[in-house]
Amino acid sequence: MVAYWRQAGLSYIRYSQICAKAVRDALKTEFKANAMKTSGSTIKIVKVKKE
């Protein structure tokens, strides 16, 4: 059985982004501000020192 998102021609990452946006849009206004604040992604890059 093929997943529905695969049948629609989506990658899993794109599918999860669409689902997350739908959930954030459905939230009540009192919870929406916190959800929008945490919806961004954070990446930390660390360079390894060679000794």
UniProtKB/Swiss-Prot annotation:
Residue ranges crossing the lipid bilayer per the database entry: none
Gene Ontology molecular function, alphabetical: proton-transporting ATP synthase activity, rotational mechanism
Alphabetical keyword list: Acetylation, ATP synthesis, CF(1), Hydrogen ion transport, Ion transport, Membrane, Mitochondrion, Mitochondrion inner membrane, Transport
GO CC annotation terms, alphabetical: mitochondrial inner membrane; mitochondrion; proton-transporting ATP synthase complex
Modified residues (N6-succinyllysine): 21, 32, 37
Superkingdom as given in the UniProt entry: Eukaryota
GO BP: proton motive force-driven mitochondrial ATP synthesis
Keyword Mitochondrion found: yes
Residue numbers bearing the N6-acetyllysine modification: 21, 32, 37, 44
Keyword Disulfide bond recorded: no
Compartments reported by the entry: Mitochondrion; Mitochondrion inner membrane
Its job: Subunit epsilon, of the mitochondrial membrane ATP synthase complex (F(1)F(0) ATP synthase or Complex V) that produces ATP from ADP in the presence of a proton gradient across the membrane which is generated by electron transport complexes of the respiratory chain. ATP synthase complex consist of a soluble F(1) head domain - the catalytic core - and a membrane F(1) domain - the membrane proton channel. These two domains are linked by a central stalk rotating inside the F(1) region and a stationary peripheral stalk.
Subunit structure: Component of the ATP synthase complex composed at least of ATP5F1A/subunit alpha, ATP5F1B/subunit beta, ATP5MC1/subunit c (homooctomer), MT-ATP6/subunit a, MT-ATP8/subunit 8, ATP5ME/subunit e, ATP5MF/subunit f, ATP5MG/subunit g, ATP5MK/subunit k, ATP5MJ/subunit j, ATP5F1C/subunit gamma, ATP5F1D/subunit delta, ATP5F1E/subunit epsilon, ATP5PF/subunit F6, ATP5PB/subunit b, ATP5PD/subunit d, ATP5PO/subunit OSCP.
UniProt record similarity statement: Belongs to the eukaryotic ATPase epsilon family.
Name under which the protein is recorded: ATP synthase F(1) complex subunit epsilon, mitochondrial
Organism whose genome encodes this protein: Bos taurus
